[in-house]
Amino acid sequence: MPLPDFHVSEPFTLGIELEMQVVNPPGYDLSQDSSPLIDAVKSQLTAGEVKHDITESMLEMATGVCRNIDQAAAQFSAMQQVILQAAADHHLEICGGGTHPFQKWQRQEVCDNARYQRTLENFGYLIQQATVFGQHVHIGCANGDDAIYLLHGLSRFVPHFIALAAASPYMQGSDTRFSSARLNIFSSFPDNGPMPWASNWQECEGLFRRLTYTSMIDSIKDLHWDIRPSPHFGTVEVRVMDTPLTLAHAVNIAGLIQATAHWLLTERPFRHQERDYLLYKFNRFQACRYGLEGTLTDVHTGNHHLLSDDTLRLLENVASSADNVGAASAINALRLQVKNGLNEARQMREFVTDGGSLIGLVKKHCEIWAGQ
């Protein structure tokens, strides 16, 4: 199946997807009963969408097309109230975080969905292990060539996005020593990491055609790239972030990505080339392992920069664009986060260090998401 034509969308519009954890109190393990909850929510929504993800312990909530983060926040807030009430009716609770800290992957049931069942057949237990929870942000583009330029531009800041959203230090009952352990789950997938090099939309079409030769790829949705074009939406989709613990933080991260996209496509500050990616996975690893305390290596000069310092530079560079797209509040909030050394992975570890249990940690995350 060829890659569809790139759908023209309004530049810099955005959509946000959040993969949420559905848990069973009082033990706070992952539930296997998301289907009745999702069915109960769907008919009550006035905007956005709630749907299944890979396994029965996941619920995906997604905005519609939004012009700015205020619209996205309003949609999410309305959806959240419906989800919370339906969850209470089903004796379930909801929380964010990139991983559940003590669930066992062997217990996870893949949704009864043709695409997910086909993926299970292709990848086996890896799909059950992929019961992890991420935030995806779509940015509208006018054409396919702009999308490819934007994809390469945003790829330079993948470590920054990972570090700002890092919220998965625990997995399978253990401290992983990573700030974001979630992305490690995908390391065994053959399409993990950045999109293979393509300099324009025509080359991307050729790349996709060759990938379909494997008989494992039917659509762009079958590819697990960190950032991928979504021609049916007319967007570029950033997929590297853990699901934050609060809707406010999720919206702020989306605002940064929207502002960065505006800066990249308006200023065109880079001439992208394939060798830009030579140290991509090393810098990505630093962000996953150490968060904002990681070290970035410049592939062209060999210079080292603290990820926190480089993130502050990014926030400064995109400030004017943030004003243009209505995301100034997001930039200000994230700047404060970086300067104060705040991150959700650290807060999780501090809770446990202070005597909290992993069960108590999930309970706390549910309270945070509910605004308690």
From Swiss-Prot:
GO process terms (BP): modified amino acid biosynthetic process
Q: What class of enzyme is it?
A: ligase
Q: Which Enzyme Commission number(s) are listed? A: 6.3.2.2
Q: What reaction gets catalysed by this protein?
A: L-cysteine + L-glutamate + ATP = gamma-L-glutamyl-L-cysteine + ADP + phosphate + H(+)
Do you know which InterPro entries this protein is assigned to? GCL_type2/YbdK_subfam (IPR050141), GCS2 (IPR006336), Gln_synth/guanido_kin_cat_dom (IPR014746), YbdK (IPR011793)
> Record keywords: ATP-binding included?
yes
GO MF terms, alphabetically ordered = ATP binding; glutamate-cysteine ligase activity
Q: How does it assemble?
A: Homodimer.
What biological function has been recorded for the protein in this entry? Answer: ATP-dependent carboxylate-amine ligase which exhibits weak glutamate--cysteine ligase activity.
Hey, which family's this protein in? Belongs to the glutamate--cysteine ligase type 2 family. YbdK subfamily.
The name under which this protein is listed is Putative glutamate--cysteine ligase 2
Q: Which organism is it from?
A: Citrobacter koseri (strain ATCC BAA-895 / CDC 4225-83 / SGSC4696)
